[in-house]
């Protein structure tokens, strides 16, 4: 094993608890297992502290009425237990951490808090997962008749909420004495991430939500247009916008 491979192996062990516990890693005997475990857990706490503070910033602002800071979950037994299976940056681990936060800060002090928690969870989970660090693709992804069937990008989430959260989110981060109110009306949001890790949120009309639900890589653009009730120009524009935010891509088949 060369120096680069050795370095990669150590980094993987620090980030991947199941690998750290494997016979493959332990058999290498590269470092004291106890010290590696302690350092790995330190890194995990730092990694998820940053993400919780960032993605659950709205619940953090509401701590004035809930008396629960989201990042305090890092000191709870549930998070300690999770560390034995955690893989830093993986979607499954991000979802598990987000669920711990949701359970910890949940309450009825703010009517729309449940919607808010789901929104923040989606942001944290969608941000996780592998990235494309160097773009080697050629051409563009604009929706044209030459494209194969579009499909939903893995990790994209369609949120159907009871409250219009986008109207209240900026207010939550401003000074207030009583929590700002959110209009109670059905709201659909698409949360998606580009291949390079940029997370975007967009409102979704019923037609756009239909496109997201039915874009499975099997239905053609015409099929999606009929399902959503969109004209050719409208479906092309919709797919172009969804592709731009990373919600949809065009399948190339197998």
Region spans (language model):
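Long, charge-rich, low-complexity alpha-helical segments
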Residues: 1-144, 194-254
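Low-complexity, glycine/alanine/valine/leucine- and proline-rich hydrophobic stretches
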Residues: 154-216
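Short secondary-structure capping micro-motifs at structural edges
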Residues: 142-146, 175-178
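Primary mode marks residue(s) on the alpha4-beta5-alpha5 output face of response regulator receiver
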Residues: 148-150
């Amino acid at each position: 094993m060369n120096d680069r491979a050795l370095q990669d192996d150590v980094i993987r062990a620090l980030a991947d608890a199941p690998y750290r516990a494997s016979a493959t890693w332990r058999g290498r005997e590269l470092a004291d297992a106890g010290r590696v475990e302690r350092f790995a857990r330190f890194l995990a706490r730092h990694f998820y502290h940053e993400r919780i503070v960032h993605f659950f910033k709205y619940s953090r602002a509401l701590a004035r009425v809930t008396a629960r800071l989201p990042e305090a979950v890092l000191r709870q037994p549930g998070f300690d237990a999770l560390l034995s299976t955690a893989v830093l940056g993986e979607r499954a681990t991000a979802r598990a951490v987000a669920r711990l936060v949701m359970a910890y800060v949940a309450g009825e002090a703010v009517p729309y808090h449940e919607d808010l928690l789901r929104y923040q969870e989606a942001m944290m989970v969608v941000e996780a997962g592998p990235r494309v660090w160097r773009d080697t693709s050629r051409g563009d992804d604009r929706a044209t008749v030459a494209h194969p069937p579009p499909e939903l990008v893995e990790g994209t989430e369609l949120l159907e909420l009871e409250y219009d959260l986008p109207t209240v989110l900026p207010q939550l981060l401003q000074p207030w004495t009583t929590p700002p109110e959110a209009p109670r009306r059905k709201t659909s949001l698409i949360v998606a991430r580009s291949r390079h890790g940029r997370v975007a949120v967009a409102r979704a009309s019923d037609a756009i939500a239909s496109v997201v639900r039915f874009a499975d890589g099997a239905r053609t653009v015409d099929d999606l247009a009929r399902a959503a009730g969109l004209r050719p120009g409208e479906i092309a524009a919709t797919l172009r916008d969804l592709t731009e935010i990373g919600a949809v891509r065009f399948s190339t088949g197998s």
